[in-house]
UniProtKB/Swiss-Prot annotation:
Job of this protein: High-affinity urea-proton symporter involved in the active transport of urea across the plasma membrane into root cells. May play an important role in urea uptake by plant cells at low external urea concentrations.
Keywords of this entry: Cell membrane, Membrane, Symport, Transmembrane, Transmembrane helix, Transport
GO-annotated cellular components: plasma membrane
Protein name per Swiss-Prot or TrEMBL: Urea-proton symporter DUR3
Membrane-spanning residues: 39-59, 80-100, 115-135, 159-179, 192-212, 216-236, 291-311, 336-356, 388-408, 435-455, 461-481, 486-506, 527-547, 590-610, 622-642
Consequence of gene loss (knockout): No visible phenotype under normal growth conditions, but when grown with urea as a sole source of nitrogen, plants are chlorotic and accumulate increased levels of anthocyanin.
Principal localisation: membrane
Expression triggers: By nitrogen deficiency in roots.
GO molecular function: symporter activity; urea transmembrane transporter activity
Tissue note: Expressed in root rhizodermis, including root hairs and cortex in more basal root zones. Expressed in shoots.
Family: Belongs to the sodium:solute symporter (SSF) (TC 2.A.21) family.
Organism: Arabidopsis thaliana (Mouse-ear cress)
């Protein structure tokens, strides 16, 4: 007869009176932290970052000389360096789902879950580096992806893809707030709807003040906090905690979890709780990459995340903001560092939840509560507070990126295109800020509606590819294929979306006999819908373009103009002409294509194939797996924290020197700068001579 409770270490989760009843859920409607802590985190951190980032932007304006024009607000001067771009990509791609859903799939499928989450969402960023270079080559003055669509394919196509891009921002924002509000509510008891409205508040404030540059600066600070928390949790699970503390303990417990001697009949098992062998895994083990559920999730993840990178204007805005020589390197580095966030974190907190035999229910897991449960079990209140802080950083950072993405679309693709084509820089800046405020309010309303409807983070994450995946290949063709035509782009994107949704719902009805949130959230219908959407969209566009090729030369995309020219003397926006040379950009494209494909093949094909012969991991193999997770997370954290500081050291020194310099001197220098700007604007030749002399000086400094 099976022992009850089955494990000594999880006795507290079982009630021995009148049998052996396991807790029906981990949280059970109770909270670990007070409501006051929840409000303090939401409002306190929000206010702090609003003030802090606004102060950093003011310091740059005051002591470095950056000018806050509409171009600067929406593009950050198009001169952001590799380290900060990589940090922004990591921060932008670290959603609530990255922290929460990755551990959910670890809880469901074992070691394959974190791997497929990380690899399935890294390759898109690596490959998007190609698009980032193509923007510099073919649309150097663009502000949004839809602006490029209109320049190439005209008004009808522009409207279609504007809808897809805005829909992507809505989907991503929904996931951020669903995950964030669920965790805040579970840990602190803050009202779910109040959390939905308050979380975006601080983001709106600092984005309003500083635009894209404030978003980038905040993203860096948020990224630092996320990576510090990541390293703490990884080392806690595998080195220092009393409950676990080593890969050997985690390994032994994961083996015991599926042992045949363990009874998983009522009342030990409850609907949806982890208990016994894993259906679809080799020998039911959590310690294997031979997992049908994990592989299907991996496919859904790959398809869905192509949509949320290629169709999210936020990534195009980051590419536009990057210095040409930094673009490809920033995206590659950002992708590789980001891999560690879901892989290392979920390999720790996700597998840790299983190794601790936590009574997490399916509903709790779907809402993203696996990581907070593990953090509480290992660290108590301090663990829940650290996890809450980490999640808040991820949600607000990615949320600010979505705000700027939507702001740019409303400003340049709606207001400047259809309402006021002759808009001045001041008018555009005003509309940008109104769009930030408006979408911030919409974010809160959207989260309330979805929570009322019972939509979970897990469901939304799997469904995103069905809704927006059909636009991926047409958008890629826009900059990569001269024959791609407008008719095929419209037909492919719209038809792919319709066919994807029909396939998704039909498969759910056929397999489960009903169409509801539960049946449509299963892997089978989700996989079918995702694949049909992305493949149909691409196939239709390709066929139409081969039948009637456009043979485009990108002349109209190169003619996109900036609203306000940057003034010479602004160091932050003087991009050397050398960086925009076609030959140099071609070399950069060849570099990112080569290394993007190498790392894509490595993490999607070679790594999983090499792990299959291990079948069920041995103790030594699991030690190796855990060490890779620890090392990747630690090294990635050091790089993403240190590199932006090294690259920006001159600016940091300028600000520090300026802060301790006599303010009268600074005012005189400001006056001199204004006079010089007026002179160069009045005499254009003077500006050309200045730029030539500046390039010569930089070359001499480099040679010296």
């Amino acid at each position: 007869m099976a022992t009850c409770p089955p494990f000594d270490f999880s006795t507290k989760y079982y009630d021995g009176d009148g049998g052996c009843q396991r807790q029906s859920s981990f949280f059970g409607g109770t909270t670990v932290l007070d409501q006051g802590v929840g409000y303090a985190v939401i409002l306190g951190f929000g206010a702090f970052f609003a003030v802090f980032t606004s102060f950093l932007v003011w310091l740059e304006k005051r002591y470095v000389g950056a000018r806050h024009t509409s171009e600067w607000f929406n593009t950050a001067g198009r001169n952001v360096k590799t380290g900060l771009i990589a940090s922004v990509i990591v921060s932008q791609w670290t959603w609530a789902a990255t922290i929460l859903q990755s551990s959910n799939v670890a809880w469901q499928y074992g070691v394959s879950g974190p791997f497929w989450y990380a690899s399935g969402a890294t390759i898109q960023v690596l490959l998007f580096g190609v698009m980032a270079i193509e923007i510099k080559r073919k649309a150097p003055n663009a502000h949004t992806v839809c602006e490029i669509v209109k320049a190439r394919w005209g008004t009808a196509t522009h409207i279609v893809f504007l809808v897809f891009c805005l829909a992507t921002n809505v989907v991503v924002t929904a996931m951020l707030l669903l995950g964030g509000s669920a965790v805040v509510n579970a840990l602190t008891g803050v009202n779910l709807y109040a959390a939905s409205f308050l979380i975006p508040l601080g983001v709106v404030v600092y984005t309003l003040a500083g635009g894209l540059k404030a978003t980038f600066l905040a993203s860096y600070v948020h990224s630092v906090i996320v990576h510090v928390a990541l390293v703490v949790f990884v080392f806690l699970v595998y080195t220092s905690s009393k409950e676990l503390g080593s890969p050997s303990v985690v390994y032994d417990r994961l083996k015991d979890m599926v042992a045949k001697s363990r009874s998983c009949t009522e009342p030990l098992s409850h609907h949806g709780q982890a208990c016994g062998p894993v259906d679809g895994n080799f020998r039911g083990s959590y310690l294997t990459m031979l997992s049908s559920g994990g592989a299907v999730f991996g496919l859904i993840n790959i398809v869905g995340n192509f949509g949320t990178v290629f169709v999210d204007n936020g990534y195009w805005v980051s590419a536009i903001a990057a210095r040409p020589s930094s673009t490809h390197k920033g995206y590659l580095l950002g992708g590789l560092v980001w891999f560690a966030v879901p892989f290392s974190l979920a390999t720790s907190l996700g597998l840790g939840a299983l190794a601790l035999d936590l009574p997490i229910s399916k509903d709790e897991a779907d809402r993203g509560l696996v990581p907070p449960a593990t953090a509480i079990a290992l660290m108590g209140k301090s663990g829940s507070l650290l996890l809450l802080t980490m999640l808040f950083m991820a949600v607000t950072s990615a949320g600010s990126s979505e705000l700027i993405a939507v702001s740019s679309l409303f400003t340049y693709d709606i207001y400047r295109t259809y309402i006021n084509p002759r808009a001045t820089g001041r008018q555009i800046l005003k509309i940008s800020r109104c769009a930030v405020l408006g979408f911030g309010c919409f974010m809160g309303i959207l989260a309330v509606v979805l929570n009322k409807a019972g939509v979970s983070l897990g469901w939304m994450y799997l469904a995103m590819g069905v809704l927006i995946g059909s636009a991926v290949i047409p958008i890629a063709f826009m900059l990569l294929w001269s024959k791609a035509n407008a008719f095929g782009a419209i037909l492919g994107a719209t038809s792919g979306c319709v066919f994807g949704i029909i396939t998704w719902l039909t498969t759910a009805k056929t397999q489960y006999g009903r169409v509801d949130l539960d049946s449509t959230g299963k892997n089978g219908p989700m996989l079918a819908g995702n694949l049909v959407a992305i493949l149909t969209g691409g196939l239709i566009h390709a066929v139409c373009s081969l039948v009637r090729p456009q043979n485009y030369d990108w002349s109209t995309t190169r003619e996109i103009k900036v609203v306000e020219a940057y003034a010479s003397g602004d160091e932050d926006v003087d991009v050397p002409a050398e960086e925009l040379r076609e030959e140099k950009l071609r070399r950069a494209k060849a570099w990112i294509v080569k290394w993007g494909l190498v790392f894509t093949i490595l993490i999607v094909v070679i790594w999983p194939v090499l792990s299959l012969p291990a079948r069920v991991f041995s103790r030594g193999y699991f030690w190796f797996w855990a060490i890779v997770a620890i090392a990747w997370g630690t090294i990635g954290s050091i790089v993403i924290i240190g590199l932006p500081l090294v690259e920006s050291w001159d600016t940091i020194k300028s600000v520090c020197m300026g802060m301790f310099t006599n303010d009268r001197v600074m005012k005189k220098l400001d006056d001199l700068n204004h006079r010089l700007r007026a002179l160069t604007m009045a005499v254009p030749e003077a500006e050309k001579i200045y730029l030539l002399e500046l390039e010569k000086t930089k070359k001499n400094d480099e040679e010296g």
